[in-house]
């Protein structure tokens, strides 16, 4: 009802109309100012999302790396990436266990562990041959702080326990980069044993399309 009264007043009096103009201008300025401030004052999460967008990706060069061998060199400098995180994944035999377990190697914590694993106790590995394991695996080896991989009796030190977000009963090993390379096996022994890992590269780029184009040119494979 008050809206109709205001309209009638404005129509009856030109002076009333003129008085409303400054108020309308002030309201417009306040609205624009509020919009600008709201667009600038982003939370940390919003800022990260705004900066990275969909520019995170994964590259599969198609390399298999033998245990005891270093990972192949790839032309990452030409890809213009801000950050890379090499990642290796395979199945390994643990002394005392009847079945193979999942082995993953990368810099930790990193983009490959975020949202997938949570540190329950201890710490993340800081050097090669240090690992974290899931509770199920730790229970399977009797709660020990050492784990032995076969063949070669490769001793690994357990420095922490992690929970897997998607499969809490899984038996998994998460190792620091360089652990696979330090396995005391020759290439011949690794080939005979069939010990090879799938090599992947996580990356962060401000130009994901350009990066993926260069990846395809250099490796003949697309980003995942």
What are these regions (language model features)?
Residues 3-224:
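Membrane transport/envelope proteins' first extracytoplasmic loop
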